[in-house]
């Protein structure tokens, strides 16, 4: 079973002054108005994964540099970004956590980030630090080395998989040159990449080594698109492969670009959520894009399957039909309060009387949950 992410703390990042979010359910569904900060919570988790593999400078550069993503309100701009991740509590009611603080590199390029501090800490009644790293010119991440050190190793057995397995997936690009439509190396098959660029290679390995998972993926795609027969996964002579598929009743083979946008996105989602090599924490921003209501129902079921198998699934969505497939306990409402992102969970005791007549999504649509546009808040 994968190590589970239990808590996320974000401070000074985009629209987030400070947010503390406990992830108490297998699936967490973030809902809120446009500009409330759902995608910023997703981006904070993506930044952590980039710090883990030391690609965060490029990640920040492509977003305009760290100075462009610091929280700002009428009182000024934040001087740092802090992110903390904690897994669930162990049997001793304790857990090890990881925290990182980023600041602009005022000694060099102010758009470049400097790691002011990385730390491992044991969370419990005293929240005592296990290991602390302070850098004078910390332009690179050493979190892997910290986690592997002799001093910290015995504390972080549950933490390292959380950091390694925190993955944000983006399947929204279905343009003509979308990654999922292109060629990839047949050997690039250990796990599905975040943009599905190696989906054909990955599906080939799943078919050869994990036939039950492969059949579940095929069955899910057939349920969403009944005309679908199977994938055609055959590497070329130079060990390159691309996604192809067959339609029932026809002899010809179709390319990925001949699938509808919704069908291609659903193939990527099914491959991720039903595959054998799911990361510990799966994060998806607006996964419902382009999906038929029947496919949205299947998406919810696949997310639950991943959650039941020891993975955390975090969905940020605008979809009332998708929200309707989840319980109030799985919902987190994201609002803008006093110019900053704030999160809370619905009051189940207050709302349970309505659930006999209304779905969770309908309650959201009727503004019983919050997470709707507020005219008292300025737009982004």
Describe these PLM feature segments.
Residues 1-2, 300-380:
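C-terminal lobe/lid and adjacent interdomain/linker elements of RecA-like ASCE P-loop ATPase modules
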Residues 1-17:
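N-terminal pre-Walker A segment at the start of P-loop NTPase domains
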Residues 2, 19-25, 274-277:
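Phosphate-binding P-loop
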Residues 25-63, 195, 266-272, 319:
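Phosphate-binding glycine-rich loops of NTP-binding sites
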Residues 42-107:
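Conserved P-loop NTP-binding catalytic core
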Residues 75-76, 91, 274-277, 305-309, ...:
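Conserved catalytic network of the ASCE P-loop NTPase/AAA+ motor domain
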Residues 90-224, 229-232:
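Electropositive, glycine-dotted interaction segments
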Residues 215, 219-274, 281-297:
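Conserved ABC ATPase signature
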């Amino acid at each position: 079973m994968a190590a589970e992410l239990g808590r996320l703390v974000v401070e000074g990042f985009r629209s987030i002054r400070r947010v503390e979010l406990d992830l108490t359910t297998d699936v967490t569904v973030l809902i809120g108005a446009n500009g409330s900060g759902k995608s910023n919570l997703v981006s904070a988790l993506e930044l952590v994964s980039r710090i883990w593999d030391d690609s965060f400078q490029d990640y920040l550069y492509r977003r305009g540099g760290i100075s462009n993503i610091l929280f700002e309100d009428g009182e000024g701009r934040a001087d740092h970004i802090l992110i903390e991740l904690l897994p669930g509590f162990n049997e001793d009611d304790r857990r090890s956590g990881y925290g990182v603080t980023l600041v602009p590199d005022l000694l060099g390029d102010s758009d470049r980030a400097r790691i002011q501090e990385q730390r491992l800490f044991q969370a419990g009644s005293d929240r005592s630090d296990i290991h602390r790293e302070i850098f004078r010119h910390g332009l690179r991440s050493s979190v892997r080395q910290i986690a592997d050190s002799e001093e910290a190793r015995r504390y972080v057995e549950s933490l390292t998989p959380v950091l390694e397995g925190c993955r944000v997936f983006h399947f929204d690009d279905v343009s003509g040159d979308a990654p999922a439509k292109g060629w990839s190396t047949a050997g690039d098959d250990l796990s599905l990449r975040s943009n599905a660029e190696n989906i054909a290679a990955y599906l080939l390995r799943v078919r050869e080594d994990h036939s039950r998972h492969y059949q579940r993926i095929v069955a899910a795609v057939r349920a969403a698109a009944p005309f679908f027969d199977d994938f055609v996964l055959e590497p070329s002579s130079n060990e390159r492969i691309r996604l192809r598929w067959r339609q029932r009743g026809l002899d010809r083979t179709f390319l990925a670009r001949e699938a509808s946008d919704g069908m291609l996105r659903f193939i990527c989602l099914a491959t991720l959520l039903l595959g054998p090599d799911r990361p510990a924490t799966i994060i998806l921003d607006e996964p419902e894009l382009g999906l038929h209501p029947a496919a949205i129902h299947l998406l919810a079921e696949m997310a639950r399957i991943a959650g039941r198998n020891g993975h955390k699934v975090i969905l940020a969505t605008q979809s009332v039909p998708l929200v309707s497939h989840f319980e109030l306990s799985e919902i987190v409402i994201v609002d803008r309060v006093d110019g900053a992102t704030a999160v809370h969970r619905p009051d189940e005791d207050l709302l349970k009387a309505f659930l006999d007549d209304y779905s969770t999504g309908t309650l959201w649509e009727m503004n019983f949950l919050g997470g709707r546009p507020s005219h008292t808040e300025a737009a982004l």
